[in-house]
Amino acid sequence: MDSEEEEEVPQPMPSIPEDLESQKAMVAFFNSAVASAEEEQARLCGQLKECTASAWLICWPRPRRNLRQQPQPQELGVIPCVGRPTRPCRGPWRSCGRVHRTVPEPEGSAEGGGVHQQAGPGQGRGEGEAAGAGVACGRLQQVA
């Protein structure tokens, strides 16, 4: 037992100035961490507000002379989007925000007979560009 007591050497107590310096360093670190977390939270809240605002946007086709001819909401084909398109869809469609509302252009104004054209992921330009376009885009679909 005496040999065990001899092996245990008490650790020296840190001096008070060292404790104060480490405490000040920790306080400064945590204050910095809190400030950066608050900035990140404010940035994310701004993105959320932007997303929410864009979800309520309504896109209308070119103005019509008679307001009674404005399309009904079911004609707009509201389709929630899971992400931002990597490039704009081409064809007779317009979209806005992260929630896309498909709006066909007036007949005769669209090239290609009013077919939605978008290359799918992993497809090159050319023959695969229009193939399965409504499915490949995944964000906009033609409203029948």
Curated annotation (Swiss-Prot):
Annotated spans, Disordered: 1-20, 95-132
Pfam families found in the cross-reference section: GOLGA2L5
Residue stretches of biased makeup (Gly residues): 110-131
Signal peptide feature range: none
Homology family: Belongs to the GOLGA2 family.
UniProt-recorded name of the protein: Putative golgin subfamily A member 2B
Species the sequence originates in: Homo sapiens (Human)
UniProt gene name: GOLGA2P5
